[in-house]
């Protein structure tokens, strides 16, 4: 196995006390956020569950700012997600907007990669993002934890893999210090998400 399983991600969410508002892990058929009056988060795979999944992204809804935050560890645009994975987040955003009173949702997303394409750590980075959304529901990308990551232009072959590799260490250090489930299962989790797991550079 490579990457993170749904069960592992759910256990880390529980270990970090991020269950409040967490809707769960979903495949590409995630319906979007329906209840607009409460804070919600979700981890979504770009592939169908029956095929084992492909790539994890994370979503957060803040009712105060009326913003939906979308985090993709690889920083892909909607067009790139469609090209590489056959996945589009546009429908999720539209479904969320249709369920709101004014049918209007502001989408804020990261535009740079923080994960190297050689690693299987997308699920773990999603956990870090949910933690940032817990710290600052209206500005998760502005937290000091998220800002400690070095953003790079997205691409199958990273321009500066060394910087992205440092992000992976920041990620592991964060989980090691905050997440008891990670500490208990670190050997297997790191083995399945490690750098150079996939040959991209």
Curated annotation (Swiss-Prot):
Protein origin, superkingdom: Viruses
Active-site feature positions: 55, 72, 122
GO molecular function annotations of the record: cysteine-type endopeptidase activity; DNA binding
Keyword Disulfide bond: yes
GO biological-process terms attached to the record: proteolysis
Keyword presence, Hydrolase: yes
Subcellular localization, as worded in the UniProt entry: Virion; Host nucleus
Marked site positions, Cleavage: 52-53
Activity regulation remarks: Requires DNA and protease cofactor for maximal activation. Inside nascent virions, becomes partially activated by binding to the viral DNA, allowing it to cleave the cofactor that binds to the protease and fully activates it. Actin, like the viral protease cofactor, seems to act as a cofactor in the cleavage of cytokeratin 18 and of actin itself.
Similarity annotation: Belongs to the peptidase C5 family.
Subunit field text: Interacts with protease cofactor pVI-C; this interaction is necessary for protease activation.
Additional comment: All late proteins expressed from the major late promoter are produced by alternative splicing and alternative polyadenylation of the same gene giving rise to non-overlapping ORFs. A leader sequence is present in the N-terminus of all these mRNAs and is recognized by the viral shutoff protein to provide expression although conventional translation via ribosome scanning from the cap has been shut off in the host cell.
UniProt function note: Cleaves viral precursor proteins (pTP, pIIIa, pVI, pVII, pVIII, and pX) inside newly assembled particles giving rise to mature virions. Protease complexed to its cofactor slides along the viral DNA to specifically locate and cleave the viral precursors. Mature virions have a weakened organization compared to the unmature virions, thereby facilitating subsequent uncoating. Without maturation, the particle lacks infectivity and is unable to uncoat. Late in adenovirus infection, in the cytoplasm, may participate in the cytoskeleton destruction. Cleaves host cell cytoskeletal keratins K7 and K18.
UniProt-recorded name of the protein: Protease
Source organism of this protein record: Snake adenovirus serotype 1 (SnAdV-1)
Taxonomic placement: Viruses, Varidnaviria, Bamfordvirae, Preplasmiviricota, Tectiliviricetes
Gene: L3
């Amino acid at each position: 196995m490579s990457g993170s399983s749904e069960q592992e991600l759910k256990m880390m969410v529980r270990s970090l006390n991020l269950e409040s508002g967490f809707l769960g892990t979903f495949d590409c058929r995630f319906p979007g956020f329906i209840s607009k009056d409460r804070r919600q988060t979700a981890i979504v795979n770009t592939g169908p569950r029956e095929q084992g999944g492909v790539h994890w992204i994370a979503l957060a809804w803040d009712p105060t700012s009326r913003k939906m935050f979308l985090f993709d560890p690889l920083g892909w645009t909607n067009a790139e997600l469609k090209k590489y994975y056959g996945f589009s987040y546009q429908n999720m955003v539209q479904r969320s907007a249709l369920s709101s009173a004014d049918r209007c949702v502001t989408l804020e997303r990261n535009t740079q990669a923080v994960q190297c394409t050689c690693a299987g750590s997308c699920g773990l980075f999603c956990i870090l993002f949910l933690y940032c959304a817990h710290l600052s529901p209206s500005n998760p990308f502005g937290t000091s934890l998220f800002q400690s990551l070095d953003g790079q232009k997205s691409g199958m072959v990273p321009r500066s893999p060394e910087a992205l590799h440092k992000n992976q260490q920041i990620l592991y250090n964060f989980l090691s210090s905050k997440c008891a489930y990670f500490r208990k299962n670190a050997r297997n989790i790191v083995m399945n998400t490690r750098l150079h797991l996939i040959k991209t550079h």
